[in-house]
């Protein structure tokens, strides 16, 4: 990365109008550069003499002219975010003052920071591991408190510690195996099959637990695309409005009111749903409404893209051919059947047994009266796995980490199978080495430059 050993600066707060704008400066000449453009209010104060973890009030100067009141926060190396000398300068929010401050710093010798360059320096200077660096953007992008807690657990180093325990156990096993094979004259105790396979099985189970929790963790952090499907006038838009908490979609007794997809993000329990209310799905003949037909095609297309399906049925009417077609299309997907209009249901109730083969969950509701909302909330959390997930526990937080953990798990499975099928310890040792290499890739201990660049290409400037 360019400027890795220069002094850099960037806006650390969102651009535009706001209460304050904060510019971060990091590098070996941070104090010298800021000293050129910062004038303390109190006589006798200077940037050069400022101690770490202190603040100073002053004004910043642009081409010698006093521009705006400014608060400087000082961090001395190595006790800073990047491990370098860091100064954070806060001025009044707004583009003009922030841009003026950046211009002053760059004129005085700072280089503009690239995306993620502050965190990259923290990694280079040993302030955080690669998994912690990845967690930085996860914390920023997290949706909901539990998603943020999950990302923060990785930022706090819990994932690195959990992977470290697995690595230590496997390295100890590998060292024993290597000593026994390579130095027979040293009278190293023989490694029994039970002990060898037992350790591999235990650590494989630990990786299985991490891998199995990835999808639910991703849902907590980023939310899930959820499509509302059903034939016309079953109450999809009423359900959307209930979940949104306001009248987002038009609701009328006229079937087919919704023609195009209506989008709305909502928080349902601990899960953020990116809802898509679709046109009612039904068979439209060749001479039918072309606009409605296009809306239905889009509805079916959305089904293929969704991470969660809420299939809505009118509980007061028998299942129609269109209902059964919807049920068949939902089979094998993360789908919940919502039996709406329970207040009108009587002898014509939809038989649950007819729908059970197609849906993992069935929830009776009356969306108009908000009846069954908690049951739907619980069903969504249970189906997506977030109900069982501990947000304080260490979890994988990127596709890269998942791929590395999967490689390690698969290598351990091969090592176990090798011994169980009568292959020698040398064959199992190769698989064990592969597993350790995958774990080193995960934590970043042996990460290539390409891997590190891949991690930081998603970062924003200022972080």
What role is predicted for each listed range?
Residues 26, 91-93, 243, 278, ...:
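Glycine-rich, N-terminal phosphate-binding loop of Rossmann-like dinucleotide-binding domains
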Residues 1-149, 153, 336:
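A glycine-rich (often HGG/GG-containing) alpha/beta subdomain
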Residues 275, 310-312, 338:
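Structural motif
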Residues 91, 251-252, 296, 313, ...:
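Hydrophobic alpha-helical scaffolding
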Residues 2-11, 15, 145-267, 273, ...:
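C-terminal-of-GTPase-core extension/linker across diverse P-loop GTPases
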Residues 57-67, 72-76, 256-287, 305:
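Switch I (G2) and immediately adjacent beta-strands of P-loop GTPase domains
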Residues 292-316:
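Inter-motif core of Ras-like GTPase G domains
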